[in-house]
Design a protein with these regions (language model features):
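The feature marks the mature, well-folded catalytic cores of soluble enzymes
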Residues: 1-243
Length: 243
């Protein structure tokens, strides 16, 4: 046995043995705390939306509430009015397809929808210089903090929500949770943790030593959040988000 192995053996021998029930007990205490807190002030679905909107707007994000039937056309008009000419989005998802169709139908020459189809090395300059906005779909949201839960993938990598000066995120109202604890439990994060889970609560901002706040230093300087009131998606998402 070498010196390293002997040292590790001594350390393990002196380490106190943790009771097998420690983690289970801690989980139970955490669950009880958050369950009791939510029981003191349960929020109806419309109240969760209102709280989510308040928290985001307090962080200088813009929130757009729209129906499942109108959000794409509404957003297309807003993008054109804001001077967006090149929009980066995931054309493989249903929401991306709907927005692309709305842009082509109403504003075929105003806003170009672009997909993330090439390695960044092949179009880095074009991406940083010409893309005005990125569109993503959040997996869920946290009403207590006004937070978007975004899981990047190959069609919509983190670059889409990080590089363009404007990030437009869509979230279905049925996926809003009361808080982080409720989201973790309802979506069973422990069963499949993603390698890159992003939580966004506003546009990128930073402050210097003089407490001067600047937006866009490390990411998008503006954030639009489209909340789709989508009762037609069924009850599964609503029940999961109600926890």
């Amino acid at each position: 046995m070498g010196a390293r192995a002997r040292m590790l053996q001594r350390l393990r021998g002196h380490a106190p043995a943790a009771p097998s029930t420690t983690l289970d007990a801690l989980d139970a205490r955490i669950d009880a705390h958050f369950t009791a807190r939510r029981a003191l002030g349960p929020l109806a679905p419309n109240e969760r939306i209102a709280q989510f909107q308040r928290m985001l707007e307090a962080a200088h994000a813009e929130v757009i509430c729209a129906s499942a039937a109108t959000w794409a056309a509404d957003l297309a008009g807003r993008l054109a009015a804001a001077g967006v000419r090149n929009l980066l989005l995931d054309t493989a998802c249903a929401e991306g397809q709907a927005l692309k169709a709305a842009l082509e139908a109403a504003l075929p020459a105003a806003v170009q929808a672009r997909g993330y189809t090439r390695p960044i090395e092949e179009w880095k300059a074009e991406l940083f210089d010409t893309i005005d906005a990125g569109f993503t779909v959040a997996r869920s949201g946290l009403a207590a903090t006004g937070t978007l839960v975004v899981v990047p993938d190959a069609n919509a990598p983190r670059t889409v929500s990080l590089v363009p000066p404007l990030h437009v995120a869509l979230i279905h109202a049925s996926t809003l949770h009361a808080d982080l604890h409720a989201a973790v439990a309802a979506e069973r994060w422990r069963d499949g943790m993603p390698t890159n889970l992003v939580m966004i609560s506003g546009p990128s901002k930073t402050s210097d030593i003089q407490q001067t706040t600047a937006y866009g230093a490390h990411g998008p300087r503006a954030l639009w959040v489209v909340v789709v009131t989508d009762e037609d998606r069924g009850t599964d998402g609503q029940q999961g988000a109600a926890a």
